[in-house]
A protein has these predicted regions:
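C-terminal accessory helical subdomains adjacent to catalytic cores in phosphodiester-
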Residues: 2-7, 13-27, 43-64, 78-92, ...
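Conserved beta-strand elements of the Class I
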Residues: 29-31
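Phosphate/oxyanion-binding active-site loops and adjacent basic polyanion-contact surfaces
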Residues: 34-38, 66-74, 209-213
Length: 235
């Protein structure tokens, strides 16, 4: 009897969740390589969008920290879509090259292209960074093209954050979104990232060093921010 009760409760929860999802016109499922840096950054977008009376009832943003690298990130995304019977939405895989093989870094993009041919209602996107998401953060302060080790990016951020009077850069900063928005320049970061990708046209993600496509997800989410916050991201 208890098992039956639990099953009915689970079915009720699934039904309520499905009803909740159907009300959301725009759905974003963000799968992050790490469990701290990337999720905390995108939680900033989520907070402001959910406070925006124009879009909060129309936009769904779910953020998962995968604690996994490259191909395992998209693998976990596929598993989530399958297990939760997701029928519509944008699936974003946010991952770093770090020291992983080029075949794995490029493989996420290739796998996304294959999956996108199967179902036009569920589209996968690769928001990669070479070498790491700190490169995207760094572009908020300067145009940078030197292919240095990722430790140099963190050193750069340390110096900038100390100049701003907020101490050292930490990977688990709760206010990383606000820090970059107020202390840096998101509009410039987007422009710089696009320029780097354009200059690397015809190259694979692993060959564009340094480089990042995180800006694509940023531009997508920025559409739903409150108007006064959008001004930090749009021309």
């Amino acid at each position: 009897m208890a098992k039956r009760g639990r099953k009915e409760k689970d079915n009720w929860k699934k039904k309520r969740r499905q009803e909740y999802l159907e009300k959301k016109e725009f759905r974003y499922y963000i799968f992050c390589e790490g469990q701290a840096t990337e999720p905390k950054y995108f939680q900033g977008f989520k907070r402001y969008i959910e406070d925006n009376p124009i879009y909060r009832d129309m936009v769904l943003i779910e953020i998962e920290g995968c604690q996994a690298e490259t191909m395992r990130v998209i693998g976990k995304a596929e598993e989530y879509v399958r297990e939760n019977k997701i029928t519509k939405g944008q699936i974003w895989c946010v991952y770093d090259k770090d020291s992983f093989p080029s075949s794995d870094v490029n493989g996420v993009v290739q796998r996304a292209e294959v999956l996108n041919q199967k179902n036009p209602d569920i589209q996968y996107h690769a928001a990669w960074s070479n070498e790491c998401i700190e490169f995207w953060f760094m572009l908020h302060f300067a145009y940078y093209t030197a292919n240095n080790h990722r430790s140099e990016y963190k050193k750069f951020l340390n110096e900038k954050f100390q100049e701003l009077g907020i101490g050292k850069y930490e990977k688990n900063m709760d206010d990383i979104f606000e820090t970059l928005m107020n202390g840096g320049n998101p509009k410039l970061a987007i422009r710089y990232a696009k320029r780097i990708i354009k200059n690397g046209e015809g190259k694979t993600p692993a060959e564009i060093a340094p480089g990042t496509k995180v800006y694509e997800l940023v531009e997508e989410l920025a559409k739903y921010l409150p108007e006064e916050i959008q001004t930090y991201f749009k021309k």
